[in-house]
Design a protein with these regions (language model features):
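Conserved core of the PLP fold type I
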Residues: 6-126, 137-139, 144-155
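Glycine-centered flexible beta-alpha turn that most often forms the glycine-rich phosphate-binding loop
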Residues: 133
Length: 198
């Protein structure tokens, strides 16, 4: 089926990832995947990091779980890593960092390769997850593609979310979430409580 045959090809084509079918979940658009992340990780007053500004739909999804937000400014080459380090030193129990690294919504900025690597290093040092929301990746018309953060990840710290809504058709409402197998088991339990779509 789609889960077994098509998804590994899709992840390889779009993100350069060698992910098995057991690491990918189909969702009803990227928004459902974002909400599933909130359900999986957040309790009231948990600390998370978002870019400032960021995608409003993500904030609306996370708001349901009443987290404490820490905002990191976005520079011309992506998230301000120095500012993020200050937050992590003050709040080392951050649950995750939510980022839109490719053509960031709403700024349109793409995170540099150096900053992607630095963000991953911090995730390993402070033991938090990176939520890489990347629905705009293939809207690039000039310049070289920057490797996805998930492609750079060797320690299972990245949860990659994407969808067809921006590159094919919003009406499809088809997205996907890629994570390590342990997290996928958790997300499958959550999704089974939300709908019966395989």
């Amino acid at each position: 089926g789609v889960q077994t045959c098509a998804l590994p090809i899709l992840t390889k084509t779009y993100f350069g990832l060698t992910a098995s079918a057991e690491q990918v979940i189909l969702t009803q658009g990227g928004q459902q995947a974002i909400d599933m992340v909130g359900r999986a990780f957040l309790d009231k007053n948990d600390h998370i990091v978002v870019e400032g500004p960021t995608y409003m739909g993500a904030l609306e999804a996370f708001d349901s779980y009443e987290p404490t937000y820490h905002e990191v400014p976005v520079n011309d080459d992506g998230m301000d890593i120095a500012h993020l380090k200050q937050i992590l030193r003050q709040f080392p129990d951050i649950k995750f960092v939510y980022t839109v690294p490719d053509f960031q919504n709403p700024t349109g900025v793409t995170m540099s390769l150096a900053k992607r690597k630095a963000l991953l290093a911090l995730a390993e040092e402070y033991d938090f997850y990176i939520i890489e929301d990347s629905p705009y990746r293939y809207l690039r018309y000039t310049g070289d593609m920057v490797p996805s953060i998930a492609w750079l990840d060797t320690s299972g710290k990245v949860i990659l979310i994407s969808s067809f809504s921006k590159i094919l058709s919003p009406a499809l409402r088809t997205g996907w979430l890629i994570a390590n197998k342990q997290l996928i088991a958790l997300f499958l339990d959550i999704k089974s409580a939300l709908d019966v779509q395989p």
